[in-house]
Amino acid sequence: MVAIVDDDPRLLESMGDLLESAGYVARSFSSAGSLLVNGLSDLDLLITDIGMPGIDGFELRDLVRKSRPELPVFLITGRHEIADQGRAQGVGGFFRKPFDAQALLAAIANALHKSTDGG
């Protein structure tokens, strides 16, 4: 299952539709807190916005890595200044909004293939 975390309901809907049309099971969460309450055990991949109230995407990624270090995490942002920060550097799954849907799907497929191959 692919979890999508974003405080923008339009992005949640469009991203969910995109993933489901590509054959993935997607669950949408409007905040990091709602994802954490639901639990991480069912997840195969996490896509999270960076700029959210409360726990932001960087903090969520760090929390997830403590309990599920093997879980692929993709960060997305519409704020280009965030994309240029040091915290975003070296993140393999990093996308700026608006992102290319096919590039995102290819990156998801690649990340899931790597995780099923054990690395």
Residue ranges and their predicted role:
Residues 52:
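Receiver (REC) domain active-site loop signature in two-component systems and cognate sites
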Residues 28-45:
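Acidic, metal-coordinating helix/loop segments flanking the phosphotransfer/catalytic sites
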Residues 99-111, 116:
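C-terminal output helix
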Residues 39-42, 63-70, 89:
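Conserved phosphotransfer cores of two-component systems
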